[in-house]
Amino acid sequence: MGARAIFRGFNRPSRVLMINQFGINIGFYMLMPYLADYLAGPLGLAAWAVGLVMGVRNFSQQGMFFVGGTLADRFGYKPLIIAGCLIRTGGFALLVVAQSLPSVLIAAAATGFAGALFNPAVRGYLAAEAGERKIEAFAMFNVFYQSGILLGPLVGLVLLALDFRITVLAAAGVFGLLTVAQLVALPQHRADSEREKTSILQDWRVVVRNRPFLTLAAAMTGCYALSFQIYLALPMQASILMPRNQYLLIAAMFAVSGLVAVGGQLRITRWFAVRWGAERSLVVGATILAASFIPVAVIPNGQRFGVAVAVMALVLSASLLAVASAALFPFEMRAVVALSGDRLVATHYGFYSTIVGVGVLVGNLAIGSLMSAARRLNTDEIVWGGLILVGIVAVAGLRRLDTFTSGSQNMTGRWAAPR
């Protein structure tokens, strides 16, 4: 069955959510890769101020996901999706006219918090509508997600030839259209409408006492830290191998990652599901993720086999990283729902995203420090060996998850959360 037929096989809310995510990522990524340059250039902010703005934007999203998830479970998925799109429209619109640091900070915080509102709600809504097709639904969702990431920067690059503020205005327009589209096309769906009324603190207590869920979040934090190296360690390695043509090599790595995500996602998911099943696929995917860094660990530079071979090792690592990331995402999203016991799904998604986001931030600081130390000592192998070790720990955590859940599966084989 082709991708188009699979897409048409989902109900209207699921299809709307997938298209919505495509639009969200186009609107976001047509702007964000170029924001720091605008802040430091035409707007004239100091480097510390640029870092502050980017940090506020990141924290207001990553740090607030659990708030968005909690609100979605209380007020329904659709209102939070619409509110998030509307707030991001306003945040980008403010960025068009912002000329001072306080106004830029407000705009950055608004755009970040908007993502914290709609992100858990979108995933909770899709999980509810997909029913038993969660893995397939999230695989298709990731195709739209990655397509937006690929196209967004290209659209932004074209608009930058005119003016950065036109790019920002266009991004605001995209989210404005998404707001209207969700109002018209997305049916109302109240999350956990039949559950007993509890306080927010009681809901949070349910989540933080869910040991299998926390084990998943901790293990996947390691996996996300490894996946993020397509933006950190691998580009830095490219600049070392090809200092005069590093951008060409980096573009090649991103092209490979994008092609795998968009063109291979459904095939990878189907093959993993048939070969290993939902639970074991997480372990296998994390194992491939850890193994992704073996090529660059064996050939960290051009001294042993030449620069060409080292470049091929780098591209191979990027390719394996892309395959592993594509393999993990659908099963990971299903696991969050399964471990929630279909209760407080958006709240679980929100906490999950916050835990992973904060963990990746800390992990990147550690990895960056390790890379600096390795460069001073001229021992690149330390970096790649450290990343492989992180992957091994993540695999061990996911295997431990099997131990947690082996005695608590319901009749459909989905993991059950503790009551």
From Swiss-Prot:
<feature type="transmembrane region" description="Helical">
    <location>
        <begin position="36"/>
        <end position="56"/>
    </location>
</feature>
<keyword id="KW-1003">Cell membrane</keyword>
<dbReference type="InterPro" id="IPR020846">
    <property type="entry name" value="MFS_dom"/>
</dbReference>
<dbReference type="GO" id="GO:0022857">
    <property type="term" value="F:transmembrane transporter activity"/>
</dbReference>
<feature type="transmembrane region" description="Helical">
    <location>
        <begin position="351"/>
        <end position="371"/>
    </location>
</feature>
<feature type="transmembrane region" description="Helical">
    <location>
        <begin position="104"/>
        <end position="126"/>
    </location>
</feature>
<feature type="transmembrane region" description="Helical">
    <location>
        <begin position="246"/>
        <end position="266"/>
    </location>
</feature>
<dbReference type="InterPro" id="IPR011701">
    <property type="entry name" value="MFS"/>
</dbReference>
<protein>
    <recommendedName>
        <fullName>Putative uncharacterized MFS-type transporter MT0872</fullName>
    </recommendedName>
</protein>
<dbReference type="InterPro" id="IPR052425">
    <property type="entry name" value="Uncharacterized_MFS-type"/>
</dbReference>
<feature type="transmembrane region" description="Helical">
    <location>
        <begin position="282"/>
        <end position="302"/>
    </location>
</feature>
<feature type="transmembrane region" description="Helical">
    <location>
        <begin position="140"/>
        <end position="160"/>
    </location>
</feature>
<feature type="transmembrane region" description="Helical">
    <location>
        <begin position="309"/>
        <end position="329"/>
    </location>
</feature>
<feature type="transmembrane region" description="Helical">
    <location>
        <begin position="213"/>
        <end position="233"/>
    </location>
</feature>
<keyword id="KW-0472">Membrane</keyword>
<keyword id="KW-0813">Transport</keyword>
<comment type="similarity">
    <text>Belongs to the major facilitator superfamily.</text>
</comment>
<feature type="transmembrane region" description="Helical">
    <location>
        <begin position="377"/>
        <end position="397"/>
    </location>
</feature>
<dbReference type="GO" id="GO:0005886">
    <property type="term" value="C:plasma membrane"/>
</dbReference>
<dbReference type="InterPro" id="IPR036259">
    <property type="entry name" value="MFS_trans_sf"/>
</dbReference>
<keyword id="KW-1133">Transmembrane helix</keyword>
<feature type="transmembrane region" description="Helical">
    <location>
        <begin position="15"/>
        <end position="35"/>
    </location>
</feature>
<feature type="transmembrane region" description="Helical">
    <location>
        <begin position="166"/>
        <end position="186"/>
    </location>
</feature>
<feature type="transmembrane region" description="Helical">
    <location>
        <begin position="77"/>
        <end position="99"/>
    </location>
</feature>
<dbReference type="Pfam" id="PF07690">
    <property type="entry name" value="MFS_1"/>
</dbReference>
<keyword id="KW-0812">Transmembrane</keyword>
